[in-house]
Amino acid sequence: MEQPWPPPGPWSLPRAEGEAEEESDLDLSPGSPRCPQLPGGGTQMYSHGIEMACQKQKEFVKSSVACKWNLAEAQQKLGSLALHNSESLDQEHAKAQTAISELRQREEEWRQKEEALVQRERMCLWNMDAISKDVFNKSFINQDKRKETEDEDKSKSFMQKHEQKIRHFGMLSRWDDSQRFLSDHPYLVCEETAKYLILWCFHLEAEQKGALMEQIAHQAVVMQFIMEMAKNCNVDPRGCFRLFFQKAKAEEEGYFEAFKNELEAFKSRVRLYSQSPNFQPVTVQNHVPHSGVGSIGLLESLPQNPDYLQYSINTALCSLNSVVHKEDDEPKMMDTV
C-alpha cells in the first residue's frame, strides 16, 4: 500500500525559545546601503535565464528525487510484508526485493550524475554570453509578454506589501508557531513567499550569515513543499498547509530522508554559488529612498552573474517538484481555511 504524501520534515533547526530573532541590520530593500544595484538589464536576464536553466535541469532532478521516493516506498512495502509468514506472500516479497535492488542501482546512477553536474558547476561552465544567446533563441520568449508582465508586477506588489510578514515567517523555528502564523495569515501560502525566502537565503550567504541562512532555507523548503502538495492534490494550498504540518511531525522513515536530502541539496547550492568565481559583491555610492520591494532588493543585492544564480534558484525549486506524489487512498481530504 502506497504511503501518504508529503514526507515529514524538514526537522526544525535547534533554536532558543520561540522564534529566532531578526537581525536589526538586515535591510533587504533596494534603497538600503546593503542592496547595490545591478547594471541595466540585469533583472531582465534573471527573468529570461530562469526558464532555460530550469528546463535543462528539470528532467535530471525529477528522476533523481523520484528514484529516492520510490525506493523509500519499496522498502516500507518490504517491511510490511516481513510481518506476515504466509507462503502466499512469497511472490510479493520477491517482487519487492527485486524492485529495491533495481531502485538502488538507479539511485547510484543518478548520484553519480549529480556529482558530475556539481563538478561542471565548480568549473564555471555556465558561460554568460552563450546562455544569453541561447535564451533569446528559445521559443518561450514568443509567449504572451503582457501576461508575463502582469504576473511579474503582481508578484512584486505582493512581496512589497507583505515583506515584513514573510520575513517573520522565515524566522520561525517551531512547527506549531509556523502553522499558527499561516493560519492567521493564509494569504502567505503562495509561490511569492517561497521565492522571497529563497532569494533571502542567497543574500544571507553573501553576508556570511550561514546560521541564519540555514533557518530561512528551512522555512523556504517548508513553503515549497506545501505548494507542491497542493498542486499534486489539485487543491488550494491554503486548504492543505495544516495537513502538511500534521504529517511533518510523524517522522516516518524514508520520507524524512527524502525531505532532508532536498533541504541539504538546496543549502549546498547556495553555498556553492557563494564560493564560485562569479561571487563578487558590489557596492554603490548613491541610494534611492526605501521602496520596500523586498524581492527586488534581494535580487539586486547579489553578485552580477544572473544566469548562474537563477539556475541555482530554479534547481532548488525544480528538485522539489517531484518529491510530492498524489495518493489514491488519501484523495484531497484537506481542511479549509
UniProtKB/Swiss-Prot annotation:
The keyword Chloroplast does not apply. Residues 278-337 are annotated as: Required for interaction with STIP1. SMART domains: CDC37_M (SM01070). Residues 1-11 have a biased composition (Pro residues). It is found in: Cytoplasm. Keywords: Chaperone, Coiled coil, Cytoplasm, Phosphoprotein. InterPro entries: Cdc37 (IPR004918), Cdc37_Hsp90-bd (IPR013874), Cdc37_Hsp90-bd_sf (IPR038189). Pfam families: CDC37_M. Residues 1-43 are annotated as: Disordered. Residues 84-122 form a coiled coil. One of its GO terms (cellular component) is cytosol. GO terms for biological process: protein folding; protein stabilization. GO terms for molecular function: heat shock protein binding; protein-folding chaperone binding; unfolded protein binding. The keyword Disulfide bond does not apply. The modification Phosphoserine is found at S32, S88. Gene3D superfamilies: Cdc37, Hsp90 binding domain (1.20.58.610). Residues 147-277 are annotated as: Self-association and interaction with Hsp90. Residues 267-337 are annotated as: Interaction with Hsp70. Residues 2-171 are annotated as: Self-association. Co-chaperone that binds to numerous proteins and promotes their interaction with Hsp70 and Hsp90. Belongs to the CDC37 family. PANTHER family: CDC37-RELATED, HSP90 CO-CHAPERONE CDC37-LIKE 1. Self-associates. Forms complexes with Hsp70 and Hsp90. Interacts with CDC37, FKBP4, PPID and STIP1. This is Hsp90 co-chaperone Cdc37-like 1. It comes from Bos taurus. The gene is CDC37L1.
